[in-house]
Every structure is written in structure tokens, then in C-alpha cells.
A protein has these predicted regions:
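Non-catalytic terminal extensions that flank enzyme cores
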Residues: 1-20, 38, 43, 147-148, ...
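N-terminal Rossmann-like or analogous alpha/beta NTP/dinucleotide-binding catalytic cores
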Residues: 2-123, 127, 218-219, 223-236
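Sparse recognition of residues in long alpha-helices and their boundaries
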Residues: 48, 79, 243, 267-268
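Active-site neighborhoods of enzyme catalytic cores
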Residues: 58-60, 64, 68-176, 183, ...
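Alpha-helix boundary recognition
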Residues: 101-105, 207, 268, 281
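Active-site cores that bind ATP or allylic diphosphates and position pyrophosphate for catalysis
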Residues: 117-256, 263-267, 316-319
Length: 319
């Protein structure tokens, strides 16, 4: 049998399996799925388990079961496999090393010996995702200074960025500009223990998996300028981005995996899959009432124009 034409639109789920999914994860997954499917697109499931100790495989397996239960089916990746293996970031170190060495050969990578406490003590500005804008403390170290510091501590490695504005149009949030040096700062490519950093890993993986659109939470909006810079340096095609508003608890707190009541494990005991999908669709402006819906039934009317731009407080009693 001949394979059908490959869709030009490829979206992705890219969860970090450090615990059970919560409503915020589910909302982002639903929007990513609807955005790709509304264009007849495909979905890739990639497991972002860079920190393998915090992300046991049992959570990844449970995550797949949860997504399937909700009706958010994917076309390749995870345990299903496919043409772009591996789909688990913990298995991709060799792939990341190739790109890392390219950046190193450009003279843009340098060792950093700063501790987290030192960075916070420096009173440097913070990015919108809570990270400290690196003040460049180790950028100009001499070879002798580096050798001396290595005797006491293994370094992490950062990418040197220019004083340059990066502007892009976000599918949900509209036009956004960040200055690489002032708003982001030189950022980590590799931790001191050898684990590659999120920014490099997602760029390499999205490119090699043919991802054309990235839908994720607004807390990652500030990562986009850094990633676009990496795409350019590595000569890789950049996807389009859409950052969806975060789902907050009714008291305004950001939902996390510590919010047990809003974990899918507990929600599945109280609601059907259609109940959960329909209520999330209502919260995100995709329907006028919290009626039960399947993901499939929401595709034809999906539009980013309906999705709010500001974070969403979960209406009292919705879940």
C-alpha cells in the first residue's frame, strides 16, 4: 500500500513526564492538537525527559494512556515510534552533541562557573519565565582563569548572544520582540553534569522531526527569541509559534503538578473525557457553554482568534 501525502503542517506534544498531567498541561495539549488538526496536520509525541532521574519511564507511559483516553491521538512518537526516532530526549545525547560542536566551532560557547546563588545575589534582571538574565560574569575569562577554576568546579556551558532584537509574530499573542543580550542574556547549552539544556534540545528535535508549529504555554514565550537565534546559527528551518494563556487556579495561582485536585488522575474519577475536553474548550473561548465535546468535534470551528490573550482563572466550580 502506498503512503498518503504527508501533511505540510506538523504539530507536537512535548511533555516533561515528571508527574501526572494537570489541567494546564491538558489545555495546552488540546490547543496544540486542534491547531494542527484544523489544517489537516499531523502530531508528533516527544517525551522531554532530559533529566531522566526526575522523569521515570512509568510517567511517560501513563501520559500516553491519558492522552489516548482524552482522544488526543498522535501520528508518531512516544512508544509508537516512527521515522524520526528517538522520541525520548534522554536517548538523544549524541544528536545534541553534533549541534553543540557546531556552535563550539563558531567560537560562541564558553564555560561558566557561576552558581545559582551567585546569580541571584548579583541582582540581575529576570526574564519573564523567572530566570536570571546572565550578566556575562564568565564571558571574558582567560585560559589561565578557566584552568584555575576547573580545579575546584566543573563548568556548565553557555552560548554567547549579540546585542540584537529578535521579532516574531506569535499565533496567539501577536508580535513580540526581545533583545537577546538585555532580555535573555548568554544562556545555558549544557549543564555541569553533561546534560544538554532545554533550549538546544528542543530546537534540534523540532527541526529533525519536521515540526512546523509549536504550541505551548505563555510561560515559554521568552524562550522563543533564544530558540530562533539557535535555528539561525545551526541553519535549521524555524517553526511558527503560538503561546497559549496559562490556566490559573480560581485564586490566581499557576497550576502545577502539585495541585493534586486538578491532576488528571483525580479528574478521571469525577468526569468523562468529553466532560473535561468540553470544559477546557469553554474556558479557552472555543465554545459558549461547558458542554461535553470530543476533540474531533472541535476541529472545524477552531481559531486562535477565539483564544484569550491573557491568563485564564479557572471559573469557580468548573472542575
Amino acid at each position: 500500500m502506498e503512503a498518503g501525502p504527508v501533511s505540510a503542517v506538523v504539530g507536537r506534544f512535548a511533555p516533561s513526564p515528571s508527574g501526572r498531567l494537570h489541567l494546564g498541561n491538558l489545555a495546552c495539549s488540546l490547543l496544540a492538537w486542534l491547531s494542527a488538526r484544523s489544517w489537516g496536520g499531523r502530531i508528533v509525541l516527544r517525551i522531554e525527559d532530559l533529566d531522566a532521574e526526575r522523569c521515570p519511564r512509568k510517567y511517560a507511559d501513563q501520559l500516553e494512556e491519558d492522552l489516548g483516553w482524552l482522544g488526543l491521538f498522535w501520528d508518531e512518537g512516544g512508544s509508537k515510534g516512527g521515522p524520526h526516532e528517538p522520541y525520548y530526549q534522554s536517548e538523544c545525547s549524541g544528536i545534541y552533541t553534533e549541534s553543540y560542536k557546531k556552535l563550539e566551532a563558531m567560537g560562541l560557547v564558553y564555560p561558566c562557573f557561576c552558581s545559582r546563588s551567585q546569580l541571584h545575589a548579583a541582582s540581575a534582571p529576570h526574564t519573564s519565565d523567572g530566570n536570571v538574565v546572565y550578566p556575562g560574569t564568565c564571558r571574558g575569562l582567560t585560559a589561565e582563569e578557566i584552568a584555575e577554576k576547573r580545579k575546584k568546579k566543573a563548568p556548565a556551558y553557555r552560548l554567547m548572544v549579540p546585542d540584537e532584537n529578535i521579532t516574531f509574530t506569535d499565533g496567539c499573542m501577536g508580535e513580540h520582540t526581545e533583545n537577546l543580550l538585555r532580555d535573555c542574556g548568554d544562556f545555558y547549552l549544557r549543564r555541569a553534569d553533561g546534560v544538554f539544556a532545554y533550549q538546544l534540545a528542543v530546537v534540534v528535535d523540532d527541526a529533525r522531526m519536521g515540526v512546523t508549529e509549536v504550541v505551548r504555554g505563555a510561560d515559554l514565550l521568552s524562550s522563543t527569541a533564544r530558540q530562533l537565534y539557535l535555528y539561525r546559527l545551526l541553519g535549521l528551518p524555524a517553526p511558527k509559534f503560538a503561546h497559549c494563556p496559562l490556566l490559573l487556579a480560581s485564586d490566581g495561582r499557576r497550576l502545577s503538578k502539585r495541585d493534586g485536585d486538578q491532576s488528571l488522575e483525580n479528574l478521571r474519577a469525577r468526569y468523562t473525557a468529553e466532560d473535561i475536553v468540553g470544559r477546557l474548550a469553554y474556558a479557552y473561548g472555543l465554545q459558549e457553554e461547558p458542554a461535553p465535546r470530543t476533540p474531533e468535534s472541535l476541529i472545524k470551528d477552531f481559531s486562535w482568534d477565539k483564544v484569550p490573550k491573557k491568563d485564564i482563572c479557572l471559573p469557580e466550580g468548573l472542575f
